[in-house]
Amino acid sequence: MQGFISQVLGPVVDVDFNDYLPQINEAIVVNFESEGKKHKLVLEVAAHLGDNRVRTIAMDMTDGLVRGLKAEALGAPISVPVGEKVLGRIFNVTGDLIDEGEEISFDKKWAIHRDPPAFEDQSTKSEIFETGIKVVDLLAPYAKGGKVGLFGGAGVGKTVIIMELIHNVAFKHSGYSVFAGVGERTREGNDLYNEMKESNVLDKVALCYGQMNEPPGARNRIALTGLTMAEYFRDEMGLDVLMFIDNIFRFSQSGSEMSALLGRIPSAVGYQPTLASEMGKFQERITSTKKGSITSVQAVYVPADDLTDPAPATVFAHLDATTVLNRAIAEKGIYPAVDPLDSTSRMLDPNIIGEEHYKVARGVQSVLQKYKDLQDIIAILGMDELSEEDKLVVERARKIEKFLSQPFFVAEVFTGSPGKYISLEDTIAGFKGILEGKYDHLPENAFYMVGNIDEAIAKADKLKG
């Protein structure tokens, strides 16, 4: 099924066929030479222009393409490698290895455009996905097969939390993770790869990168490449997979560029008219089935901190939980710097998590909120002017704040403290004890950077001794 290139407009390429019309999303391959080098360019059909002419989006730079070059339609969408062989390697949007490691052949490949699981195959049970991170499990628990938004500025610890989650899934749930770098900096991708290598989690994760410098087609479709690899682990191997998308905003942004290049009339703020349906199509594939689940953590960049911007607003509609990182908390030296009052989860419901967990979580939030309200009085008049009751609230709040910190496995190199995975039962028991006043006699420093409450008691004895 050969055609030829009739027009090249940046990343948009028109291809003519004589007696064949490729379907939308079908892949077309162009092999050509430019500056003495051989190139293989993959195009994806985006529109039919009539008379067997199709308009395609290029998955790589179109430098060196000329009219009249032969193009071959593959009769199927872009297909990428799947299975255990993909672990520990880096792929681009078309499923080629880009980590300069040894070349291996993949026996299994899946198309990146797939339907979401049928309704009867989906699991409707609401289950908590235990992460081993106290602040997350207690106050904004993740749903198995749910979607989590990770909000935070530069340098507050998004990547460290992502790596800790990958570590805990690998070692505690013996599960796999997939990381899709969607339109982010190449340097960050490189750093992540090296850090994963150092913290021994690389062999449990597959990495797919479509970086900032690539054409919009590659940046948009890389999310589907990563998702397809995760779907294989869920559907064929029956695993609970963790899928990271950094950054989901770039998925919408590249979609808007593609839409403009294809000549579609833009909608609000210049975004593509199909923004909601594209996002819905993608997010619907991330779900739990009766065989396994894909739990996704999506970093969300909010342009100009405007939460009403159509791109982040469309993402919000799909999220089950939000983990908000706060610079003020990081400045206090409390890591992970998760904001206990701003982070939310639909799982925080007594019918799902049980009465005890719900009461402890709400109790913790209420004490922290009271402490926040008293900050101004403390700043102006000092602690001595508070009533005895308020003094107690402040003391407990400071202990809770410190106890929400914990040493991470992936940060052992920097902190020198061994990482801790805290079970949900231990987390609830610890905070319940603080709220009930069982540990009012312990110094607040005993609660800083420890795992469960027993470690805090042991640390207090050490501090006394």
From Swiss-Prot:
InterPro entries, per the entry: AAA+_ATPase (IPR003593), ATP-synt_VA_C (IPR055190), ATP_synth_F1_bsu (IPR005722), ATPase_a/bsu_AS (IPR020003), ATPase_alpha/beta_chains (IPR050053), ATPase_F1/V1/A1_a/bsu_N (IPR004100), ATPase_F1/V1/A1_a/bsu_N_sf (IPR036121), ATPase_F1/V1/A1_a/bsu_nucl-bd (IPR000194)
Catalytic activity, EC: 7.1.2.2
Membrane topology note: Peripheral membrane protein
Cystines in this chain: none
Entry similarity comment: Belongs to the ATPase alpha/beta chains family.
Role played: Produces ATP from ADP in the presence of a proton gradient across the membrane. The catalytic sites are hosted primarily by the beta subunits.
Protein name: ATP synthase subunit beta
Lineage: Bacteria, Pseudomonadati, Campylobacterota, Epsilonproteobacteria, Campylobacterales
Gene that this polypeptide is encoded by: atpD
